A protein has these predicted regions:
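Extended, low-hydrophobicity, polar/charged segments
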Residues: 1-127
Length: 127
């Protein structure tokens, strides 16, 4: 997040980080896109998803999304990947998600990010 913010000359919070979690089984992955300064609140995650927050290993992230950690893209993901956007992003007009590699990003309005990510819904799972 810090390096991306420096490269783009924006505050770190505007970097939209995509976090990868285990879904209900081995064939499903949950992506949560948050503001760069946000942290997952385990209690809120458990309440919303009805399961414990379990982040994927770097190997499983690459297998599930096709991207390495640091470059996970919130859009154009394979079947079985469900994407949610955290409300921590909504304080910004535009944010910068990764585009599939650790050295790529695109500036998007939050409504564009929601649409392009085929997001299921806005959620509140961060501190």
């Amino acid at each position: 997040v810090e390096l991306a913010a420096q490269a783009l000359s924006v505050e770190p919070a505007r970097i939209a980080k995509t976090l990868s979690f285990q879904g209900e089984d081995e064939n499903h992955c949950i992506l949560i896109v948050t503001a760069g300064d946000a942290k997952i609140d385990n209690s809120k995650f458990r309440h919303f998803f009805k399961m414990k927050a379990r982040m994927l290993s770097p190997e499983k992230v690459a297998e599930s999304t096709g991207h390495a950690i640091g470059g996970v893209c919130p859009f154009a993901n394979p079947e079985g990947v469900r994407t949610y956007l955290d409300i921590s992003l909504q304080r910004f007009d535009t944010v910068f998600p990764a585009c599939g590699s650790s050295n790529s990003a695109i500036e998007l309005h939050c409504d564009e990010l929601f649409r392009y990510a085929l997001a299921i819904q806005w959620i509140d799972v961060c501190k």
